[in-house]
Amino acid sequence: MTPETFPAPPYPWQQRAWHWLLGAYAGGTLSHAYLLEGPEGLGKLDFARRLAGTILCDEEPASSPCGACRACIQLAAGSHPDYRECAPEEGRSAILVDQVRALSAELALSSGYGGARLAILHPADALNANAANSLLKTLEEPVPGTVLLLVSARPAMLPATVRSRCQRVGFTAPGRDEALAWIGERAGGPEAELALAFTGNAPLRALDLCTQGIGELHESLSREMGELLAGRRDPVPLAEEWSTRDLALVLTWLAGWTGDLLRRRVPGAGRGAGLCRLDEASLAEVDAGRLFAYLDMVYEALVALRTPRNRQQLAETLLLPWAGPGRKPRVYAPGLARGTG
């Protein structure tokens, strides 16, 4: 941790999970591994860091990091001997096996201060196959006094053997009114509701979007997608145009737009948030059964942006499915030939 990443207070939508884990800590019943799972933008990493800070704090009993003891000062400086974070190295999208082996070797050492040892892996779904297998050995034979916190927005990408050896702590987005009230205390403005629609009520992601002029972007992207589906835009030049923008922000919008389309198109999927403005005739042409696979493609593209990639090619991959034969949008699953199935 650094002063910029020192644990934030638990957010209102995290209170239940916080009190449960705090009770386990106070009662001496903490598990050796937890999987903190839920959509992005809910503050799971903040939660993990605060829990680690509470456990390592010298104050007893600690219900939060005091911020003033030796342990808290070292955590803020990133020098605590009993705390580690494991994440993809700069320019990579995966956590590699050598990183996990090094982490496991450190956790096997005696505690620097005679207490617990904490490690956070984030995002845990970035573990490649070899790294996950290496971590599994640590999970199967935990070193006494160690606690592993795995943070993931896509837990299904983790091997079942890893998931089964962790206690799972689920995080869900707050209701719209609660999220809107929280953002209103910090940013407010007319774009707050739009930002929440972008992100599926994920307050932290929405708060970040409120500062990025998303209203104008929303109007532009909505118009472009409408023109693409109507056959008035070619996907390749449009992909080139998208690649010159903040592509992470564009794909965040596309994920929200697709989720809104899914809610409108699939019976029982819930009420749309107003991002997708397609008329009923256009909606009827969408292959609804493949929308889930397409949404996965968008999220995978967002992950791919962490590494040096051909941005235009990524955008083309996501736009071409909407310009299928006869200009009828066909959302297809990865690996399937277009126009089949």
Predicted regions and their residues:
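Structural recognition of the conserved hydrophobic beta-strand(s) that form the central parallel beta-sheet
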Residues: 119-122, 135, 146-152
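Conserved catalytic network of the ASCE P-loop NTPase/AAA+ motor domain
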Residues: 26-29, 59-63, 75-79, 108-114, ...
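Conserved alpha-helical scaffold flanking the Walker A/P-loop in AAA+ ATPase domains
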Residues: 19-25, 94-118, 126, 130-138
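Flexible beta-alpha connector loops of hexameric P-loop NTPases
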Residues: 89-97, 124, 168-169
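Conserved Rossmann-like nucleotide-binding pocket used by diverse enzymes
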Residues: 84, 120, 167
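AAA+/P-loop NTPase substrate/partner-engagement loops
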Residues: 64-95, 156
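ATP/adenylate-binding site constellation spanning eukaryotic-like Ser/Thr protein kinases
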Residues: 80, 100, 132, 163, ...
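Charged, glycine-rich active-site and insertion segments that engage polyanionic ligands
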Residues: 1-54, 62, 71-74, 144-147, ...
